[in-house]
């Protein structure tokens, strides 16, 4: 395989990233190729910037009863995302493509989604793709198996990818755990910090921004715009509390396996924030734990993880 045939599509809450890759079977690693392009849902004329997802309890109930009832707004928003993905595929039509997406999936599409519309028939609309990969899995796969990854030599570690939500990852004895099938390993959105806050709502960049906006009647869009706000120090203190809760839960699991966490890698938007602007906050995080923290600030890793997941499937 080479750059002409391998690519990954990383679907997020606001955009799609396409990244081609050069795969080496000799070292079982993928390197970034020449194609890198982002497609924003908001560029579509029908994008609803005020879209509100169906409550998670309702989504889960409908999924479990095999009776998913999409609202008109969900269908419209889903169609925007489908159109965007289809457009992105056009620049890599001659490639073998892997695609990752957040949310709970069936073999046909997205059936539970915390930060967007459900699209239960997604594969029907993206014919070249036979299955949809988990975004969390692709994040950590990219960190391990891409030449730009920060976990290439990690035997026992945890990954915390922060964006619209939290991408959770665990490497145990050199293997990526399937968190959906592992007992005793709740994901960030399942770990309560208080009665109405989870690790995900307090630690993800989107959650941090939402809390600030709700508390201050503001409309801040990006984390970097909060750095010099007086309220931000407390919000980051709450983020640190959530981080420590997550680490404690993960340490408990590793102890049950007679292993110790070797390192923590913080990636995606949260990693980029720490890398670009948040040095003093990173120091607070590092001083709170004896486990070394590394930062992954390259946003291409998830797409490369999707690409190599396809190559090795």
Where are these predicted regions, by residue range?
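Adenine-nucleotide phosphate-binding core of ATP-dependent small-molecule kinases
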Residues: 62-95, 201, 209-274, 292-302
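Conserved glycine-rich phosphate/nucleotide-binding loop
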Residues: 2, 286-313
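Glycine/GP-enriched mid-protein hinge/lid loop-to-helix segment characteristic of carbohydrate kinases
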Residues: 5, 16-59, 131-133, 146-234
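Glycine/Thr-rich phosphate-binding loops that ligate phosphate moieties of nucleotide
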Residues: 8, 14-16, 20, 25-28, ...
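Short active-site-adjacent structural elements
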Residues: 167-169, 272-278, 303
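Glycine-rich phosphate-binding loop and adjoining helix at the ATP-binding site
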Residues: 45-156, 273-293
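Short glycine-rich anion-binding loops that position phosphate/pyrophosphate groups of nucleotides
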Residues: 14, 102-105, 163-165, 270-271
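Short glycine-aspartate micro-motif
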Residues: 6-10, 96-98, 156-161, 265
């Amino acid at each position: 395989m080479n750059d002409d045939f391998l690519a990954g599509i990383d679907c997020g809450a606001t955009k799609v990233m396409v990244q081609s890759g050069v795969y080496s079977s000799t070292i079982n690693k993928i390197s970034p190729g020449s194609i890198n392009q982002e497609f924003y849902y908001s560029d579509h004329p029908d994008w609803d910037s005020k879209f509100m997802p169906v409550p998670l309890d309702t989504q889960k109930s409908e999924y479990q009863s095999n009776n998913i009832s999409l609202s008109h707004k969900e269908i419209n928003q889903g169609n925007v995302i489908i159109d965007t993905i289809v457009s992105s595929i056009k620049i890599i039509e001659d490639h073998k493509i892997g695609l990752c997406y957040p949310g709970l999936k069936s073999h046909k599409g997205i059936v539970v989604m915390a930060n967007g519309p459900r699209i239960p028939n997604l594969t029907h609309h993206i014919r070249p793709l036979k299955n949809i990969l988990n975004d969390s899995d692709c994040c950590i796969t990219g960190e391990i198996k891409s030449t730009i990854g920060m976990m290439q030599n990690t035997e026992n570690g945890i990954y915390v990818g922060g964006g619209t939500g939290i991408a959770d990852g665990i490497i145990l004895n050199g293997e990526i755990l399937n968190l959906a099938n592992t007992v005793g390993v709740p994901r960030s959105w399942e770990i309560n910090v208080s009665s109405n806050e989870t690790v995900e709502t307090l630690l993800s960049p989107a959650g941090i921004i939402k809390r600030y906006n709700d508390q201050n009647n503001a409309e801040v869009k990006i984390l970097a715009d909060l750095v010099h706000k007086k309220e931000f120090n407390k919000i980051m203190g709450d983020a640190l509390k959530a981080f420590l809760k997550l680490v404690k839960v993960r340490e408990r699991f590793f102890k049950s396996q007679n292993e110790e966490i070797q390192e923590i890698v913080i990636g995606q938007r949260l990693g980029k924030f720490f890398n670009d602007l948040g040095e003093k906050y990173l120091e607070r995080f590092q001083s709170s734990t004896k486990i070394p923290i590394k930062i992954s600030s390259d946003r291409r890793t998830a797409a490369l993880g999707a690409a190599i997941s396809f190559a090795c499937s």
